[in-house]
Every structure is written in structure tokens, then in C-alpha cells.
Amino acid sequence: STIYDLLVLEYQFSMWQWGTPVSTIPALDSDDKTIVDYFIKMCGPDYFAAENSIESFFVQAVKDFGYYGYNIEPFHKYVNEEDIEGYLKRVLLPEEFADVKFDDSNYRFVTDFYTENDPKMILIYGEVDPWTASGITWMRDRNKKNVKVFIQPGGSHTARILNMPEDMKNQILEQL
């Protein structure tokens, strides 16, 4: 089914996003229940359910942020590309938003704002979180006095002030 295919494709993103240790992946000879339980824990089907708790994020992603695609190459012979194409609008958006078009004006506004200004701000990212790639980590390379970008080594989507390395945590607290 399309949802199952999407879950298989989502798995690799989820694994990196949440910093899941490879050692937690069940062995190939594990029983079916162990494998299915692990798979559902990593990327449950509720992510692709109608009226999802993060539905508003999906609307904003389609309209303002953009959204990641999937690497289907390893699964090419198993996945129907037509089922996957346009899945975000077809599967994750309420029908009334099906015709929403991407508008990069908010993205450009934010980028211009950070380029032209130096607000007192702390940005925290995890090194292995795929979302870090779309962050404004490029601010580290600018001569900004007030904008500080911290990338937690080995960190995931769970990167927080409390779990930063001590030296970074001290810099963050000093900035606050």
C-alpha cells in the first residue's frame, strides 16, 4: 500500500532525525513481532494519518518551508513512483489545502532579515538531524555578534541546551 511504502521511505529520515543508534535495529533473524514493533516505534502509521496532530505543520511546509523528498533509489523495483509522487499534498494535507502552492517569500524574508540584521538569538541544531541541512547554520560563517549558532556534535532533533556539551552550554547560557 502507499502508506506502507511511505513508512519504509520515512524510516531512514526518522532514524537520523531522532539520532537512533544503529545498535537498536533488530537483527535480521529477529522474530516478526520484534521487527514490526521496532518499525512502528520508529515511524508509526499515524504520521500519515488524516487529521494528524501536526497537520498544520504540513500545510505550512507545503506553503512556506518546503519539505524533504525520499530517496527511492534503493527501493525502485518495489515502489510505484506514481503512488509516491505528490504524496505530501495527497496524503498529509486536508482536502481544502490540496491546491496550495509553494511561496518562498517568507523564506526570503527570513533569510534577508538574518543577512541584514544581528538580533540577539540562539539557534540550536543536532549534527545528524536531517533538518539541520535546511537550517540557517550558514549564520556561523557571518561576522555576527549576537546571532549564535550551535550544532550539537552527534546530536539529533533532540538537541537542547540541557544536553549540549558543557562548553557549548556555557556559551549558550552566557548569551542568554
Regions found by a protein language model. Give the residues of each.
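The feature captures the conserved acid-bearing segment of alpha/beta-hydrolase catalytic domains
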Residues: 105-116
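Short beta-strand/loop motif that positions the catalytic acidic residue
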Residues: 117, 123-125
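Conserved beta-strand scaffold positions in the cores of enzyme catalytic domains, especially
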Residues: 123, 146-151
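Catalytic active-site module of serine/aspartate enzymes centered on a nucleophile-bearing elbow/loop
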Residues: 151-176
